[in-house]
Amino acid sequence: MTNVTGTERVKRGMAEMQKGGVIMDVINAEQAKIAEEAGAVAIMALERVPADIRAAGGVSRMADPTIVEEVMGAVSIPVMAKCRIGHLVEARVLESLGVDYIDESEVLTPADEVYHLNKRDYTVPFVCGCRDIGEAARRIAEGASMLRTKGEPGTGNIVEAVRHMRQVNAEIRQVASLREDELMTYAKNTGAPYEVLLEIKRLGRLPVVNFAAGGVATPADAALMMQLGADGVFVGSGIFKSENPAKFARAIVEATTHYEDYELIASLSKGLGNAMKGIEISTLLPEQRMQERGW
C-alpha cells in the first residue's frame, strides 16, 4: 500500500490557522470541554499532564487510544496527541485515529536516541520542540509544520521558555544578516541544514509558526511570551494544576489575545486563586530536564 502524505504547504497552513491562540493539555472529555469553552484553538490529549509525568518518573509513552478518542468525540476544535521521539508506530497509530496534529515530544521518554521521525512521510502535520535555531532548522528539514519552545515542561516556571524564544529569535536576526557564503559555515557550526537557513534568511523568520511552551502558568506568562514574538501559546500543566482551571483557562486565552493591554491583564489576574506550584529549574538534576531530550 502506498502512503498518501499531506503536502508541506497544506500542513504548514493547518498550523498557521492556530496562530494567536492557546493550545491546552487535557486528560479527559470533561477537561477538553472546559478548554473549548474557554476559547482554546486546539487541545492536546494526554494520559497525564507534564507535571504528573515528571512526578511519576519511569517511562512515559503515548496515551491510551481510548483517551484520545474520548477527547476527540467531546469537542469540535482540533485535537493533538503526543508520540515519543523516533517512535514510528506510535505516530502511525495516532495518525490512524484521525488526530489533527502529532507532537513528537520530549515530554515523553524518547524511543530513539539517534533519529527523529521523518515527518514528511505522514499525512498529519507534526509539532516539535526547539531551543535554538539548530534544533528548529533540523525539525523543519524533517518535515515539522509547527514548532514550540521546549521550555521546561511541568515546572510552572517560564524562565526556560523565555530563554529559548529569545535564543531562536536572536539567531534568526543573525542568519538574516549573513551573506550566503557565510551561511555554509554557520550551518556547519549549528548543525542546521543549509537549505532551511536560506529559507529563514529569505523570509526573515522561521518558515513555520513557533509557539511558546514549557512553563506557562499565568495570564502574565502567556502575554510575556507573545510580546517576545511567540505565534501562540501551549499550556500544559498550568491550567488543570491551578486552583480554578476554568478561570485560569479563560484568563490565559484573553491575555494571549490582548497581550499588550496591561489593564485587562491586571483584571484577568485578580481572584484567580493559586497558580500551579512551580519548580525552581536549578533544583532539577540533568536527567530530570526534559528540554535536553532530542537532538
Swiss-Prot record:
E.C. code: 4.3.3.6
Reactions that this protein is recorded to catalyse: aldehydo-D-ribose 5-phosphate + D-glyceraldehyde 3-phosphate + L-glutamine = pyridoxal 5'-phosphate + L-glutamate + phosphate + 3 H2O + H(+)
Residues annotated as the enzyme's active site: K82 (schiff-base intermediate with d-ribose 5-phosphate)
Amino-acid positions noted as binding D-glyceraldehyde 3-phosphate in the UniProt annotation, renumbered to this chain: R166
InterPro entries listed in its UniProt record: Aldolase_TIM, PdxS/SNZ, PdxS/SNZ_N, RibuloseP-bd_barrel
Binding, D-ribose 5-phosphate: D25, G154, G215, G236, S237
Pathway: Cofactor biosynthesis; pyridoxal 5'-phosphate biosynthesis
Taxonomic superkingdom: Bacteria
Alphabetic keyword roster: Lyase, Pyridoxal phosphate, Schiff base
Lyase is among the record's keywords: yes
MF annotations from Gene Ontology: pyridoxal 5'-phosphate synthase (glutamine hydrolysing) activity
Keyword tRNA-binding listed: no
GO BP annotations listed: amino acid metabolic process; pyridoxal phosphate biosynthetic process; pyridoxine biosynthetic process
PROSITE patterns: PDXS_SNZ_1 (PS01235), PDXS_SNZ_2 (PS51129)
Similarity-based family: Belongs to the PdxS/SNZ family.
Function: Catalyzes the formation of pyridoxal 5'-phosphate from ribose 5-phosphate (RBP), glyceraldehyde 3-phosphate (G3P) and ammonia. The ammonia is provided by the PdxT subunit. Can also use ribulose 5-phosphate and dihydroxyacetone phosphate as substrates, resulting from enzyme-catalyzed isomerization of RBP and G3P, respectively.
NCBIfam families: PRK04180.1, pyridoxal 5'-phosphate synthase lyase subunit PdxS
Subunit-structure text: In the presence of PdxT, forms a dodecamer of heterodimers.
Protein name according to UniProt: Pyridoxal 5'-phosphate synthase subunit PdxS
Organism per entry: Bacillus anthracis
Gene name as annotated: pdxS
